[in-house]
């Protein structure tokens, strides 16, 4: 089975399958790509703490795939998979999306009040906001370094891993600050007449964990 596939958006899937049983550990693995409509594929939704099923569990029962669906050379799928994951890690870190979230956070903190003062005027919350702005800027420049290296044909290496981890952590911290800035209303999620932004901040807080 394959856990956490986005079948909601995908009609193709790739799999790493062992095609040479006697080959060494990372050898004898082939990289296949084929349709999600292939007979024998079953998709089961995985409901998360958000209450939604953004990811799915995919099961394969006697699935048969034509040999021409192999990507690259037979038995060399491990190298193809590493290249795929390298690009995926770089794509998962999106500083522009985080900057948009920060702008929305600033607007929220200017509107929400803690006691008689705006949330953005609270020194502790403001310090957290400034720290997040600095972290997102650093992540953006790290992304530029990765792009520059890629254009020169150099591998991203550990820098891509840093971007992926940093992106997830910063997204969660931004949502956490928004919830704290809302005060007691920050615990409200869906189906509440007083929820803010449709419960998006709470949803993101749980999704980015």
Please state what every model-predicted region is.
Residues 18-22, 35, 39, 61, ...:
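Short, well-ordered loop/turn and helix-capping segments at boundaries between secondary-structure elements
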Residues 29, 55, 75, 160-162, ...:
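Active-site lining segments that contact anionic ligands and/or coordinate catalytic metals
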Residues 4-7, 49-50, 209:
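Glycine-rich phosphate/pyrophosphate-binding beta-alpha loops
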Residues 4-44:
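A short core secondary-structure module
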Residues 2-3, 195-209:
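Short, intrinsically disordered, charge-balanced linker/junction segments flanking boundaries
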Residues 114, 123, 137-196:
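C-terminal helix-coil-helix/basic helical segment that borders enzyme active sites and/or dimer interfaces
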Residues 41-141, 207:
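Glycine-rich beta->alpha junctions and the first turn(s) of the following alpha-helix
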